[in-house]
Amino acid sequence: MKKAVCLLSGGMDSTTLAYVAKDTGYDIVALHFTYGQRTEAKERECARAVAKNLDALDFVEISLEHFTKIGASSLTDTSIPVEEYAGEEEGVPSTYVPFRNANLLAIATSLAEARRAEAVFIGVQTGDYPGYPDCRPEFIEAFQRAVDLGTAAEPRIVLMTPFVRMSKVDIVRKGLALGVPYELTWSCYQNDDRACGVCSSCHYRREAFRELGLEDPIEYER
């Protein structure tokens, strides 16, 4: 059976992504990163639960403490407030972690090469492009070229981004069809008991369920 490394944060997109990879015929090596984010413990708990539910081959957790030293993100620096959702805005949000996906993809590629996996799955999606430069299709394409140049020829490692042209609603719809246990996932940027309900991540998650006429299975504070 084919093998894939799946970046699994424990959030809604990455969990759906792992189920898509499994449904496509891959055995899953779940890769989870901790980097001093506010909801680190909750994300780890959710990612572990999802990996177990998926019967993943392995759950690999890697710490990237350097992101807390780099700073400049409200996810890793508590002195920077997490913005409440206030409609679509231009520019890079405070929750952007500088060049994070390059770090994550580099390590995921290393793991894929070590495990002889044919693919690395990452859940970048349409809504991420405007504010997160390292989620753009052009960035993924450029990173694929780097992977091709910097890894062994066989097996070729392909970066898989099945959500790159999909909205959050499309992702939830796909996940529901695959039986994704969204009650095991976490999206909130700042709380780890009850989701805040006001950060942009909570907003987009809850709106996706609402557009489908469904109630989000996790509890919200507001």
From Swiss-Prot:
Cofactor comment text: Binds 1 zinc ion per subunit.
Recorded GO MF terms: ATP binding; ligase activity, forming carbon-nitrogen bonds; zinc ion binding
Domain of life, per lineage: Archaea
Keyword Ligase: yes
Reaction it catalyzes: 7-carboxy-7-deazaguanine + NH4(+) + ATP = 7-cyano-7-deazaguanine + ADP + phosphate + H2O + H(+)
InterPro entries: QueC (IPR018317), Rossmann-like_a/b/a_fold (IPR014729)
Enzyme nomenclature, EC number: 6.3.4.20
Cofactor(s) essential for the protein: Zn(2+)
Top-level class of the enzyme under EC nomenclature: ligase
Classification via NCBIfam families: 7-cyano-7-deazaguanine synthase QueC
Function: Catalyzes the ATP-dependent conversion of 7-carboxy-7-deazaguanine (CDG) to 7-cyano-7-deazaguanine (preQ(0)).
Protein name as catalogued: 7-cyano-7-deazaguanine synthase
Species of origin: Methanoculleus marisnigri (strain ATCC 35101 / DSM 1498 / JR1)
